[in-house]
Amino acid sequence: MVKSPGTEDYTRRSLLANGLGLTPPMGWNSWNHFRCNLDEKLIRETADAMVSKGLAALGYKYINLDDCWAELNRDSQGNLVPKGSTFPSGIKALADYVHSKGLKLGIYSDAGTQTCSKTMPGSLGHEEQDAKTFASWGVDYLKYDNCNNNNISPKERYPIMSKALLNSGRSIFFSLCEWGEEDPATWAKEVGNSWRTTGDIDDSWSSMTSRADMNDKWASYAGPGGWNDPDMLEVGNGGMTTTEYRSHFSIWALAKAPLLIGCDIRSMDGATFQLLSNAEVIAVNQDKLGVQGNKVKTYGDLEVWAGPLSGKRVAVALWNRGSSTATITAYWSDVGLPSTAVVNARDLWAHSTEKSVKGQISAAVDAHDSKMYVLTPQ
């Protein structure tokens, strides 16, 4: 039940009422690969591929349109209008199709006068109307960007859409995208289900690693219902090696980031599928305890990331950011285990288990690669 504004419960966590985001969202978004080149055929084919390739069964449920899906101007009633040339059937028909596959449809708007592409209107001043439109179409997720915002603080603009979505009559996941500018981790849990902590990612090692670091400092603010978002996945887009993409996916999973695929899944190669479909890594991301793992130890370019899981287990990643193979060691004292603990160590990428490990775990890790483990006390 939604409490009325002003009551303590409402102030503390207004969006618990939508019941969404108890684990980080999983799915796909059009922006990283397609930018403004999206149409209803692409969205339908992506939904088909999500199911036929087995990704939907692994938890990838959201099929999200990003910028450029609407006409430049609203209609005579002030409503957003899907672009006739690219979405001739309209968004409701598209949502119906996506829902028929057992998936959910996401859409995009902006807390400003226009979206970032300037090819369609933003929702500033139209929040109630647009939220009702999205609900009437059967939309399940809204990414809400931060361009052309008239220099009004996001702390003022985003709660208006948050309340509009709560009043829309439909449960809609609310993804804040103000790029971490006003430290949303400190205030957005009352407003949305996820919040970007960084500027946009691009498909490069330097961008990916810097997003991971920027996101990491906010780890303590994440939890069920509200997640830090270091931006969408670049896995499969070609700008990094398979090794680097493995690190990207491992750290995003450990950090409880939204796992939103950003490549063309219709034509992804086997290596990309192997990364995105690792059920053991996904299980770390989706663990019901919902504690964001973080960087616990650094030895120059060698890093240990770790976080607790349900059942007294611990997830650990050994990440080599250097240019040559090196041995990385995680000591129990660094990862939150009692020094006397004896664990079974499951290697999530090799799919093998080492039994009765004491005190520490070490591995030789190739340049830019990572090893990922779940440690289960005996």
Curated annotation (Swiss-Prot):
It comes from Coffea arabica (Arabian coffee). This is Alpha-galactosidase. One of its GO terms (molecular function) is alpha-galactosidase activity. Belongs to the glycosyl hydrolase 27 family. It catalyses: Hydrolysis of terminal, non-reducing alpha-D-galactose residues in alpha-D-galactosides, including galactose oligosaccharides, galactomannans and galactolipids. It is an enzyme of class 3 (hydrolase). Substrate binds at E178, W179, G180, E181, E182. Residues 1-15 form the signal peptide. GO terms for cellular component: plant-type cell wall.
